[in-house]
Amino acid sequence: MSKNLSKYLYQDMDKEAGIQHTFHKTKIVATVGPACDTYDKLLELVKAGVKAKIIEHIRNINITEPYNISILGDLQGPKLRVGEMKDGGLPIAPGDILTFTSKEKVVGTKEKIYVSYPNLHHDVQVGNKILIDDGKLEVVVVNITPDGDVKVAVTYGGVLLPKKGVNLPDTKISLPAMTEKDIIDLEFIIEQKLDWVALSFVRKVEDIIDLKRRLSDKNSQTKVIAKIEMPSALDDLRNIVLESDAVMVARGDLGVELPVEKVPAAQREIIRKCIHRAKPVIVATQMMESMIDRVKPNRSEITDVANAVLEGADAVMLSAETATGNHPALVVETMRKIILEVERTEYRYNREEDLVPQPHSPSFLSDAICYNACKLAKDANADALVGMTQSGYTAFILSSYRPRSPLYIFSKEKSLINQLSLSWGVRAFHYAEEESMDDIIHDQHAILKERGFIKTGDVVVNTGSLPIQEHLATNMLKITKLQ
């Protein structure tokens, strides 16, 4: 047994912050920008309830404060945009005929508008829709000229502002998944050893395979998140989920590329597939957008966050609300309260009946142990469910069952501790001893007792693997009443 238990502790943020009894199992991801780019402002967000971030300062917070927060890097992907506009904006009306060009960066007028897509004239066809500024403006292709310009007729007009995004919902674009900028950014992500990297505009599973190959070539432990925001990704969703380490429902562009009425069902299907494959899933975009400049969310936003929790998302994400909003910490705190209330009153815990292990699966035996650990924890009304993992697989599987009992994961892999911050219900601890299984379980119970998570008389379900030194898949299950 360890002589000094404290050196193995992951200092759980909820315990140290005095809110261990209000731990929210659905995690919060916050985007960092000018509104929260200082150490003190970031610390406010962390104390409010954030579990994963896109930021540099987090490492300092993880070192100096009692938190383990994930760092998530975002690759922009092939985002198409219009160029500059004369007078800062170009009024367009239904029926206007415009010319799009990718050959020269002209200042936009009704005669010619630059679009940052060299293959535009090759990929679009007459009749294809082109959406601009998140779908606020819509045009349709009426002609493709011999010299490579694209003539369009305005369907829905307004003011065409500079640098606004362009979506091609009817077109299969031929750009690579990663741009030159993405490749440079990936080098930085690898160098900085970020926990997660999100790939934008994933279209097919090969996009994820390529990114994972690049990470593997550099011996990087960074895990990959596939952002689902293209109809083609939905067509290949099963394979993308299987190949990715996690998935993000990126509803901004998805809601432009798809008819808006199809987005709710798409979100639910993505979440369902991720839970069935034990892959963390994040619901993102415009969740609390009114709080960019207000102190209270719209009622529809409250329901949106609640529905994401009820559908089983591992995490919900804030974007402009924390990056550029006026009240970043208040937004996080408000979201945390919504999550806690839903989990307290309405959440459908224990999904193991939906996820019975399949005998043909290569991981059937370890899956069966995890499945029955969650079932046993439920039947015994256990006060804690404890898992051990080296790769993270056991943690992801146990989390996917959404167990009623508090879930604690121990790992000797320090890189995993932060990565697991994204998973539903997981509180992770670093523990590197490899003695007898009885000693390891004794240590785990002592650590959890020391932190105030369990006490004498509590029932605890443990999983592990034997023999310890062989690091096999989970193959052991034990239930204990603490003395």
Question: Could you tell me what each predicted segment is?
Answer:
Residues 1-483:
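Non-catalytic helical/linker scaffolds that mediate oligomerization, partner binding
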